Amino acid sequence: MSKGKIIVAMSGGVDSAVTAGLLMEEGYEVIGVNLRTWEYEAPVCDTTKKSCCSPEDIRDARDVGLSLKIPFYVVKMEKVFQEKVIDRFIDDYQHGKTPNPCVECNTFVKFGALFEKAKALGIDKIATGHYARIVRNGERYAISNGVDIGKNQAYYLYGLSQENLKNVTFPLGGMTKPEVREIARRMGLSVADKAESQEICFIPENDYRKFLEKKHVEFTPGFFKLRDGRIIGKHKGRENFTIGQRKGLGIAWRNPLYVIAIEDDGSVILGEENETYAESFSVIDVNYQGFAPLGEGESFECRVQVRYRHTPIRCRITKMNEDLVVNPLEEVRGVTPGQSAVFYPLNSDYLLLGGIIRKGSIRMQVAKEESAIAFRS
């Protein structure tokens, strides 16, 4: 007996292929969908480079659909991808931030827009090949990391709504990558040993600076400064830098220097290693998953992860106006505006909430005040 229809987002990789195969074995009527998000036109992209969502990946996804004997469709998502991912990517760099396009893509395209397409077809359920699980915390749903510690992808999924979480399934959450490849071989899938892409899909050369140049973005030149306001050099564009960066500065100094702030006027503030640690920072555009929205002034302890592959640390968060103020209780460096911060309970691995790191921390704000005094004197 059929369990009903389900849409599987098929990228052309082994993970989504096995997801489709497993759901078929469970009795679902699987419909494969590939999301065409990006027009691969020269000279912006070199299609000979390996990246996800490429024409090669679409062909691989279609081949898997034929092998599994399931309906397969390519759905055009270029417009929403341009608005929600690429335009934001460019805007963030133009404002001194370091964007996280994979988070935006998951939130607005792979789940947001795909769910809308599914509902238009009268289908409630979708599935993807993410290594994640869904748990319940009381009346709320939340993402939890998968069992494969090398593939934990909860960080990229904090933007999913409660409605999304009720209707999505992740069949690979309880598996490891080697196990998934072995299942693909058993199923006779052509992508069983296909290499993974590590690049942003619309930047196959993994060079965002070249991408910005080809999109005719005007870089904002300025000065390299120390925290006390001293000018120690010039640069050709703040878009070339990110918080925590050490290489490629071209500044000779007695000790290694790191980017610790990027200013609105184009100034790039440099400091030594001990100046890279955040005292506090704020988070905006918060989405709550396993935790009910905080009231004004409410506060509690949890753990925060400030980038992918970062080990979560203890912190205290407080709701202030529309923002969350985060006070780390352990040392953390490289807190980067534009990147995502996600929060977990102290003793569990499911997501409480997440949001975008806003520019500045208390430590950096103090530095700005000191710099202003230095310039006035």
Swiss-Prot record:
GO (cellular component) term, any one: cytoplasm
Q: Which reaction does it catalyse?
A: S-sulfanyl-L-cysteinyl-[protein] + uridine(34) in tRNA + AH2 + ATP = 2-thiouridine(34) in tRNA + L-cysteinyl-[protein] + A + AMP + diphosphate + H(+)
The record places the site described as Interaction with tRNA at H130, Q339
Q: What class of enzyme is it?
A: transferase
> Where's the active site on this chain?
C105 (nucleophile), C201 (cysteine persulfide intermediate)
Single GO term (MF): tRNA-uridine 2-sulfurtransferase activity
Q: Provide this UniProt record's keywords sorted from A to Z.
A: ATP-binding, Cytoplasm, Disulfide bond, Nucleotide-binding, RNA-binding, Transferase, tRNA processing, tRNA-binding
Query: Can you list the disulfide-bonded cysteine pairs?
Result: C105-C201
Keyword tRNA processing listed: yes
What HAMAP family does its record include?
A: tRNA_thiouridyl_MnmA
Role noted for this protein: Catalyzes the 2-thiolation of uridine at the wobble position (U34) of tRNA, leading to the formation of s(2)U34.
| Protein name, per record | tRNA-specific 2-thiouridylase MnmA
Name the gene that codes for it. mnmA
